[in-house]
Each structure stands twice: as C-alpha cells, then as structure tokens.
Swiss-Prot record:
Residues in coiled coil: 38-67
InterPro entries on file: Phage_phi-29_Gp1
MF term (GO), any: RNA binding
CC per GO annotation: host cell membrane; membrane
Protein name (database record): DNA replication protein 1
Function: Protein that assembles into highly ordered structures and provides a specific site for viral DNA replication. Probably anchors the viral DNA replisome to the host membrane.
GO BP: DNA replication; viral DNA genome replication
Subunit structure and binding partners: Homomultimer. Self-associates into large complexes forming long filamentous structures. Interacts (via N-terminus) with the primer terminal protein. Interacts with host FtsZ protein.
Length: 86
C-alpha cells in the first residue's frame, strides 16, 4: 500500500529528477497542494532584504543630511516622505 501524504506537514528539501533536475517541495496552501520553487523563494527573500536595506539607507540619508534628492527618491519609490523630512 502507498504512503498517505499528510497535508499538515511540509516536505523539506528538494529531490533530484533525472529529466527535470531539482524539483521543488509540495506544501499545503489553504488546503490545496502547491509546488514551491526553493530557488525562486531564496531569490525573492534576497531581493526583499536588499530592498529593505536600500530603503533604510535612503531614510537615514534623508534624515541626516536633509537631502532633497533622497527625499524625492523615497517619495517616488515608496510613496511617501520619510519621517521628519519636508
């Protein structure tokens, strides 16, 4: 008899498929099974982290130097003026 997939647990890691290469994991999402591409998830996490670092650096530059360009970039990219900026 085959294994019963427990939808409450996530499968950790990837498996190697001779035809398609590394495969993602299957994880339950709102009761449905969904393939998760681990490499894509890692890239998205890295981009989100870099975005947060850039945003914090611009806020700090705008605050410390009262830099109008940094304030403008923050307004264009993030939709608002930093705290304490004009």
């Amino acid at each position: 008899m085959g294994k019963i997939f427990d939808q409450e647990k996530r499968l950790e890691g990837t498996w190697k498929n001779s035809k398609w290469g590394n495969q993602g994991i299957i994880a339950p999402v709102d009761g449905d099974l969904k393939m998760i591409d681990l490499e894509l998830e890692k890239k998205m996490t890295k981009l989100e982290h870099e975005n947060k670092l850039m945003k914090n650096a611009l806020y700090e530059l705008s605050r410390m130097e009262n830099n109008d360009y940094a304030t403008w970039v923050i307004k264009v990219l993030f939709g608002g003026a930093p705290h304490g900026a004009k």
